[in-house]
Amino acid sequence: CTSLDCAELGGDSAGCNAPTGRSTSCRTISGSSACYLSCGQDSDCRAGYDCIGAGTGDGYCGTAGQTSPTAPTAPDTGGGINVVCQSTSISGGRALTFDIAASSVAFAVVPYSQADLVAPSRLLLPNGQVGANFATDHAFMTVNAGILQTVAPVVFPAAPQFQNIVQQGGGRYTLEINTSDDSPCYYVLQKSVEGSKIDMNIYLVGVNGITAANAAQNAGMRTMLDTMRRIYSKEGVTIRTVRYFDVSGTDRERYRIVRNINDCYGLVSLSRAPGPTLAEKLSVNVFLIQGFQVAEAEGLLGLSLGAPGVPGVHGNEGAGLVFTSEYLSSRADMTGQTLAHEVGHFLGLRHTTEHGGTEADPIQDTPVCSNPDRGTSCPDATNFMFPFSLGNTQEGISDGQGFVLRRTLLTQ
């Protein structure tokens, strides 16, 4: 996600602006760091919100089931996406086997369940050795278990130092997952060359004065896209095709102002494959709304429903990203940075440093900040994947980040 840096704007020591007589805390919920109102009981929260953790001394106002989107719909088959619903029982879950070609430079596995939670455990190489352990060297990839819960897309290699995973000469791999569902499904996508082009489907959700018919000519939209192009082109990646769609009727009225983070799941579920071919399906769904008014996540600018998101399959809770058009007319360049940031998440990039400085991305050539609340003084503050929008130019990108962008299955 991207948030305004409250500390840079004069917030309290936690980086949050608390209402008079109330306290707030910065928390990571569903993979997103944001400010939440503290509480001791449900009555401390506004209508429609509960005190999560009431009685523990560390409660916060949120929605019941905040991290529990509904089970994904079954993906449409065909067009190069082959869904398999066969697996082997192992202790604590299931083992999914699949073949990867010797020529592949990257692959994605997307396990999902209609009945239970799904979380990756280990990836076994063709020789039986552990190529990725999601409790240790690949722990950064478990974020989707908290965001999506019932679907867990994983991409390999997730950073340059993990190239050996795809340098095995091809063969049969096994992804072990934790789940109580005895019949989970999955699909596998792989590519034999690096990609350089990204296709996007931009859904306009009540954005003032902009429709699918005039979006391509809108000055703010052009500046926004040019900013993203400028960032990504430094690593040989560009935007190829942009398709525009209007979200209309009751859906527009329901989602144009997002007041509940959970609504983002329903919003991206409105996406549809732009065409029947795999090339058309391998596109990024972007939902541009009027704005966020989430009291418990003040300053939120954008949110990706997955890191990485669900590749190639549309119409589900992990099929896109949402960001605000609030600054499109006044700061289209900053909106473009937000777009580049959220697309980066959807393609598999993490924040250079997470809030509080306790975690960082796995990419070895991105700087790390001991406390991102320091804002502009952080060594990674100018990187486009810094967790806060600081209101200045944040267009830096590293070679390691470019490595990930070129290998994602959504870059063709």
Where are the regions a protein language model picked out?
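Non-catalytic extracellular/lumenal accessory regions of secreted precursors
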Residues: 63-98
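Propeptide-to-catalytic entry region of secreted or membrane-anchored zinc metalloproteases
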Residues: 78, 86, 113-115, 124-283, ...
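Active-site-proximal segment of zinc-dependent metalloprotease catalytic domains
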Residues: 268-354
